[in-house]
Amino acid sequence: GRGGIGTVFRDKKIKAIVAKIDGVKGNLNNVVDLKPIMEKGKKFNAEMREFDDDQAEMRTKGTAHLTNVMNDYDLFPTNNFRFGSHPDAEKVHSEVYKKFFTQGIPDGCWIGCNMSCAKGVDNYLLRTGPYAGDRVIVDGPEYETAASLGSCAGIFNPDFTIEANFYCDTYGICTITWGTILGFVMECYEEGILNDERTGGLKLNFGNADTAMELLHMLAKGEGFGVTAGLGVRAMKLMFGEKGWGDPKFLFDIAMENKGLEYSQYVSKESLAQQGGYALTNK
């Protein structure tokens, strides 16, 4: 869903597309030789049941199990990719998210998968925005969202991440893109490229969860600095440079995007494959 399809939907006044068919089953794609696949599937499912609770814990934590793994290996994007780890990351440890996730129900993305790593937060009380006071179901957060709407903006608060996750889904905004945008504008603010006058009074320091949430709602309503942030990292770095709001080379260095698409949430220094994915993406 990344790359602008949400903008196309909005232009066409489409909220969502739902495809439904009768008779959903594991062999929906009509494979040529089903028997060996079923045998491998049984083996894979048995291994998940036996080992997952002691290894990745995907069945109870989903992809959010990666938060502490990435932090331990200095690969957890922090403060707009300045750092790969942070002492406060313990506040968003996978054990913390595990307590938020509803457990014990089949919540997978496909029939027959007994890992069911797609997690959700049920009965979550919203504190801000148009649905403040409502209790809702939040899909996720997945790892990418836990990092983008968290450490990338210097925010280590699961409640912020879960609520921002809900509103990004509701507003039709990519959580990865928005988190990387947040990291960029926060670094610009801390480096003096942006100031209170240019942000309309928003104090966009790393870690300022209240202002980050306010900016998300402004973006959705097309108000104030939310309009500027909504342009994306590439457009902002060019615009700020043209306005003389900072050294264009420095803006280029801190703009985590390629071909106009904001980076996903991995510090790529340890992975040539990840670097290639960022640099050679066809968007």
Where are these regions (language model features)?
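Extended C-terminal regions of large enzymes
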Residues: 1-283
